[in-house]
Amino acid sequence: MEKRALFRSGWLPWLLIAPQMAVILVFFFWPASQAIVQSMQAEDAFGTSTSFVGLDNFVTLFEDPAYVESFKVTAIFSVLVAGCGIALSLVLAIFADRVVRGALFYKSFLIIPYAVAPAIAGVLWVFMFSPSIGVVSHGLRQMGIDWNHLLNSGQALTLIVVAAVWKQISYNFLFFLAGLQSIPKALIEVAAIDDAGPLRRFFTIQFPLLSPTTFFLLVINVVYAFFDTFAIVHATTEGGPGRDTAILVYKVWHDGFKALDLGGSAAQSVVLMAIVVGLTVIQFRYVEKKVQY
């Protein structure tokens, strides 16, 4: 039976949640409403005049080949970040769940990237992959790979994917490790008695029980790749070479603060907001229905 808290005063629950509601109103709903209004306006570069243009900014946006290309780059980037990040984190969590000696150091070491700011993470990786002084680029040259992400768009995309995956790996690792440790050991021991090997035990017992965690992390990682990687891209490639790594969130900033197209930039932010709302709905409505136990 579900228990509910009873309050003598009907206004007390509302009073308790009022501070949080105020934060949400000021820092989410107000900026979101401002972006929607601004996306339907055209403003000159000096901000002296504003005119209502309706949906013209959205029409111009989807007719722009650069925006369509940015959408494609973002889709590829998101798939790579989510796929590689989840797979690598799961492998590391499996090792952490089994390791005995040095377990505390191993787990602490894997949590460190989460404490690093995205901009700092981008700077660290751009130094390591620097064509002139980078340790990693030097090692790649020793292997016969001519690394220069400033000129090669494929290498630039690889760089931002690696940096983004490294930054998010701690978050994924913690959830997978918690999920693995919550699985009853008796199930695994029974499977071992039935001569099931490690791989079979993982794919028939552990991975199906981790499906809620995996689905949750899939949505979170896609949202992360779409919205929380601006600092990494800005610190590593600045959307280059050309605009080959200009993901959507970076293009919002570039068009708004560099090109001074405030209406177009606001329209792009509204599109991004619609994407995150859609992903959130998928997460909360289907996470219970689509997972396999």
Which stretches of residues belong to each language-model region?
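A structural signal for multi-pass alpha-helical bundles of membrane permease subunits
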Residues: 5-293
